[in-house]
Amino acid sequence: MINAPRVCVQVQSFYVESQSEPDEERFVFAYTITVRNLGRHEVQLLGRYWLITNGNGRQTEVQGEGVVGEQPIIHPGSEFQYTSGAVIETPLGTMEGHYHMTDHQGKAFQVSIPVFRLAIPSLIH
């Protein structure tokens, strides 16, 4: 059994009304992600994979190196936080995915990003 480093991911999403155009089926959402290293050694975030699903069930996959132009090294007991965004065609959707990371010995591992909702405030009860 391989012991992957302990990394926690927390997400908060919000609707960006000022950049959205509902009449044109353009709904802009931002999300802030905090990646915490709960382990005893540093880890590095090298890339990400996203599965974005709109309210009609249409899915888009996005993958790439780093996050917001960085490949941060996260030291034990510390965190890396960033804000990014997504544009979908419906007022409701979801995102989920994973990060590609390496441990202090250069061994690759993945950290899941739990599914989170993209929703305009009037849809949340």
Swiss-Prot record:
InterPro entries on file: ApaG_domain, ApaG_sf, Uncharacterised_ApaG
One record GO biological process: error-free translesion synthesis
Domain ApaG: 1-125
Source domain of life: Bacteria
Protein name (Swiss-Prot/TrEMBL): Protein ApaG
Naturally occurring in which organism (per UniProt): Pectobacterium carotovorum subsp. carotovorum (strain PC1)
